[in-house]
Structures are given as structure tokens and as C-alpha cells.
């Protein structure tokens, strides 16, 4: 089973694995493997935390709303898709009205397709807009 918890040694373990992968066979010089590994580790670390924090929050929201844990995956998928789109729109030139309209449309479309609770989806959207 893969360990999906971010621990104190997660960054070091990831960096070690990437260095081994990059330097296998001796084709790549060690300095280049170190540079690539350091850059890739920084990108990994920057992208890991937002989604991890979101997953933990979604699990708590689902627990408090009484959603069976077998359905949590749908809520996590919704939250990750919404976060990706939200960050893209926020970085671009989208106005707050456009973002709010997109979120409302995403909630209704996803809930009609999958049958998830609109109230819970709205709580997830509120978490995303207030924390990112």
C-alpha cells in the first residue's frame, strides 16, 4: 500500500527516489541529476500541500454531513477538479462574478451527474474560495 501521508521525511524520500531514478546507468552526470532532482522536488512540494489540505478538509466535511465514506471519493474528485479550475481562473483575468458563476454551474452539473449533495458540494466550494 502506498503511504499517502505527508511526513517529515517525505521530501527527503521523494528527493532520494528521484535522484536514484535520474542517475541510474551513469548516463547523466551526478551534478545534472542533483539539479534536476532539486528542481523536481521543489515543484512536487509546492503542488502536494494544497491538494492534501483540500482532501483532509473534504473528509471532515463529509464526516460532519454524514456522507458514507464509500462516496467520499466523488466529493474529493469534485473538490480537486474545482480547485484546479479555481486556481487557474484566479491566476487569469476572471472576475469574481465569473468565478462564482463557474462554481455554481460546476456544483449543479456535478451533482446532477453523480448524485452528490449540493449542500456538501457548496461547503467544499466555500472552503476552496476562503482558503486558496
UniProtKB/Swiss-Prot annotation:
Q: Could you cite one Gene Ontology molecular function of this protein?
A: DNA binding
- UniProt entry keywords in alphabetical sequence: DNA-binding, Virion
Write down any Gene Ontology CC term.
helical viral capsid
Q: In its keyword annotation, does this UniProt entry include DNA-binding?
A: yes
Indicate where this protein resides in the cell: Virion
The keyword DNA-binding is assigned to this record: yes
- Free-text comment on this protein's domains from its UniProt entry: The N-terminus projects into a DNA groove.
Describe the task this protein carries out.
Self-assembles to form a helical, filamentous nucleocapsid mesuring 900 nm in length and 24 nm in width. Together with capsid protein 1, wraps arounds the DNA and maintains it in an A-form. Capsid proteins probably maintain the DNA in A-form by non-specific desolvation and specific coordination of the DNA phosphate groups by positively charged residues. This certainly protects the viral DNA under conditions such as the extreme desiccation of its host.
Q: What is this protein called?
A: Major capsid protein 2
What is the organism of origin for this protein?
Acidianus filamentous virus 1 (isolate United States/Yellowstone)
Its ancestry begins with: Viruses, Adnaviria, Zilligvirae, Taleaviricota, Tokiviricetes
